[in-house]
Amino acid sequence: EFRGILQQLYDNGYVLVSLRDLTKNTATDDQPMFEQGDIYLPDGKKPLVLSQEDANFDTYRIDGPDDDLLADAEGDGFACQLLVNENGELTSKYIEADGTVKYGAYDFVTILEEFVRAHPDFSYHGAKATLALTGNEGVFGFQTHPAWQTELGVEAYMEQVRQAQQVAATLKANGWSFAAQGYSKLSFADSDTDTLQSNMLKWDEQVASIVGNTDILIFPLSSDIGGVDYYSGAKFSMLYDLGYRYFCNTDTASHWVQLRSNYLRQARRIVDGAALANEPGVFSDLFTATAVLDPSRP
């Protein structure tokens, strides 16, 4: 489905741009002064910001009901890890039901990498997408949660961290950016400021230490810290003080952007199986959903 979507986006004239391309900072001190960014595309081309949430390879993606942390016959066929191969390229680890291990383009990142290699003009200045990460189940399929240090031992645990850092560095070099999605997925609308702050500080400790700091926040659970009015209040002040300047909520509109001097908020359209099957018209300006929906979906 994703390969079909990418091909249609390309054929329809879309070009990947970074979320940060939407702004330029004209400040002369530490405080931002955002203005609309300048994006220069060939005639007929249209900018597209792409992102993926839950780019963690959480346990449910790689395990069946037996909790052995291995793919099996009752699993759902997800890739289980993002790696850097011996050639310095990103690759996905995929385990067949019979235990056979494969490496290749089996997930969002590696499929997009493959597509841009074949169609370099699909990317503006090398931009790929933004990956939103949580931290409570590790990063990129590695056991980077501190609780694993006791079970694995210090040396093996640090090797997991080192490999995850290598993946992060390779992603950055290849035009990817990272967004926080909270240490664990909480509703930013329903949780109080202190709870959210504690959650975000855990993200800094356990995820930023691997992927680096970020100024992008992709809200989990289709939540937000405010309505369509300009941001204000304790939650915004807390997140701003933690360094966040780009905020992404969800919406079904073709585009929705709120640019202020000190932040940018952009709505995201969620592309998943339910939306492709039940709301195909939401994507009509991007691609024809019925043409890419896999009939093998339950």
Predicted regions and their residues:
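Metal-dependent polysaccharide deacetylase catalytic core of the NodB/CE4 family, i.e.
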Residues: T28-E35, L41-L48, N56-I225, A253
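Short, glycine/charge-rich beta-strand/loop segments that flank catalytic centers
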Residues: D21-D29
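C-terminal active-site subregion of NodB/CE4 polysaccharide deacetylases
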Residues: E1-L22, F34-L50, R61-I62, A173, ...
